[in-house]
Amino acid sequence: DVVQLIRGPNGSFVRLQIQPGNAPPGTQEHVLTLPRTKITLEAQAAKKEILKVKRGDKELKVGVITVPSFYQDYNARAAGDDEFRSTTRDVRKLLDEIKAEGGVDGLVLDLRENGGGHLSEAIGLVNLFVPKGPVVQLRETGGRVEVLESEDKAAAYSGPLTILVDRFSASASEIFAAAMQDYGRGLVIGQQTYGKGSVQNLYPLDRYALGQDPGYGQLTVTIGMYYRVTGDSTQNRGVQPDISLPSAISVEDVGESSRDSSLPWNRIRTSTFKPEGSLAPMLAELQRDHDVRVAGDADFRYTQAEIGAFESMRSEKSVSLNLEQRKADRERRTQQQLA
């Protein structure tokens, strides 16, 4: 219903009355006016940025590629366009540009808020960093297991790799992050991912109707489960990061495990695969370095304090009916945020 209210003619405007989720009672709402326009593939496409990071007396170049979704221009591909856009093609192009610009000392793939998309693109993206090998296992409801593999191609990038994830990284994002983790190819940083390990298919109901145009819609049916090459499912548990970052998003409130009808986690046999390496020996040192950096970073401390204040406010089970008391509480929280 909300989506239908937001949608409208191209060029028109929609006004949204917004109150932040962590705002105390009585906070004034903000009105946000947005122009309606057609969402293009370009707006959702992968993008790159080169950051210069100081490390001691050295200046390192770090490439950051943001991947909002696992997309593919199906219409262009169906029309025979050899230059159709896709996540894998666009990221490879960005990697080629980075190489042409002198390369980088490390690469970050940002999959935060990436809710997934085409499975084939997740497999293709893995292939840019890992040569041929199994990427994900698919078990159907009847028990048959299919191992989906990447092609026999040389990796487009073989340097240090980090994958950023959050609680909204789901489905294809989890498949990619899990493969990078299992192959020891990249360090996963962020929050526990969404935990969507089930496979759905759409069945149009009109095919069973007798009328000309009944408009019965379609039915979404779960037909299987995804599993990592290790045999573990991503269902409910998602992908656990190697290094955790603070987040105000509650795992209990957001994610597949928060749903009443969520399927349980399970595992199957491990697929045969050869890890690219192992990050385990350096994880303890990385965690120590991370803890030291967080302790000395004012922005991190502020973020953690805000999260603590938000958790405290969310745990409150009652609100004062006295207006002056509510105003005083709001002012106190505001001062805490500014401190």
Language-model segments: residues:
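A broadly conserved detector of short glycine/acidic/proline-rich loop/turn motifs that flank catalytic sites
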Residues: P20, K38, P68-Y71, R167-F168, ...
